[in-house]
Amino acid sequence: MSLPKELEKVLEITKAQNVWRRTQTLNLIASENVMSPLAESVYMSDFMSRYAEGKPYKRYYQGTKYTDEIETLTMELMNEITNSKDCDLRPTSGTIANAAVFRVLAEPGDKALIAPVQAGAHVSHTKFGTLGALGIQHIEMPFDEENINVDVDKAIKMIEEVKPKFVVLGGSLYLFPHPTKELAQHVHAVGAKLVYDAAHVYGLIEGKVWSNPLKDGADIMTVSTHKTFPGPQGGAIFSDGSEVFKQVSKTIFPWFVSNHHLHRLPATAVTAIEMKYFGESYANQILRNSKALAEALAERGFKVIGENLGYTKSHQVAVDVRQFGGGNKIAKLLEDANIIVNKNLLPYDKPEDVSDPSGLRIGVQEMTRYGMKEGEMEEIAELFKKVIIDKKDVNEVKKEVIEMRRNFLEVKYTFDDMKDLEKYSSKSLKLII
């Protein structure tokens, strides 16, 4: 019997996606990454078919003995590499993690301070997203465009005047660390809590190239497990013994999560172990690559944000492309050449420019995991120039991109090349390519 046409279509689309994004494109989306083959193999396990509500050893379902083991082990590993005391892996995304924290810290009508939207605040921090859904007022802290950061003195004054229930630091356009130490004591002085959204920089924190906000005064930290931390898509919440964490942990189930997608757990554990042994070298290479790419783009005539500050201290690079037609046009043009980035608001844009902002946001973390280094960042900058400035035929540039990727198809910073793993491997679990 031949396969139904519908099934053939599903398999064709899946294969096309895997071939395209795994072997033919420069993946420079700042919020994405790639798991190791080992992490992917344990991701595709029986856990994906199972349910487990509640906390380990206190479940509402039977048949969870191995779920309890893997969840407990994964939390221990995550606390170890994060240098934290508390971890909850049940949020299924960073936004769900934020929602649980925000709901505990404030009631409808209460106030929260955030960074401006156009300066990098994630949509979940705003009235357009999770805060709005919870009925919490968002007030934007003053922002220093020259230093691409929260204006500390003005923010302190606002904290003292507004007396919010909580303050959120961290963001989705995040070139430089927010002033956690500088604001923490002032936040606490008015009885508020400091929430740090480390979704984008969690892997950098673990790699010890970004200051740990829990050690700098943050009460609680939310993360994604699939950006600079190269694990499965999901979220987590950490604290260093905060009472807030206990309250939040009680609300995740049943308010925000029922079953928490158990197949994430072994893949997250594998990634945590990879980061334990390879995280520092990976994070350091990410920073070298982002700096190299920013400098190479600037040398070729692009307006790279943050020149006076060294361009970036994270995995991200931000480029103003207004003179070439704006972020929307240029992101699409680059995609035609198999270079994948996203359009992004820049600090001096208006919130209403979100559909066609001035900028591009570029992230180097995924191509770094494929083994690219500073030399390849020079090549990538040259490809940007060919597409955007030189206006070369995008199909010709696409050929160059595909040729470049042929040398960077294997995930690095992992144990996958060790023969000891062969007894655990299963060819049936490999991606369809």
UniProtKB/Swiss-Prot annotation:
UniProt keyword RNA-binding, yes or no: no
Cofactor dependency: pyridoxal 5'-phosphate
Activity-regulation annotation: Is completely inhibited by addition of NaCNBH(3) in vitro; this reagent is a known inhibitor of PLP enzymes, that reduces the internal aldimine of PLP to the catalytically inactive and stable secondary amine. Is also inhibited by L-cysteine, which forms a thiazolidine complex with the active site PLP.
Name of the top EC class for this enzyme: transferase
Record-annotated membrane-spanning stretches: none
Positions bound to (6S)-5,6,7,8-tetrahydrofolate: A121, H122, V123, E243
Matching InterPro entries: PyrdxlP-dep_Trfase, PyrdxlP-dep_Trfase_major, PyrdxlP-dep_Trfase_small, Ser_HO-MeTrfase, Ser_HO-MeTrfase-like, Ser_HO-MeTrfase_PLP_BS, SHMT-like_dom
Similarity comment text for this entry: Belongs to the SHMT family.
Protein name as annotated: Serine hydroxymethyltransferase
Native source species: Saccharolobus solfataricus (strain ATCC 35092 / DSM 1617 / JCM 11322 / P2)
Organism lineage: Archaea, Thermoproteota, Thermoprotei, Sulfolobales, Sulfolobaceae
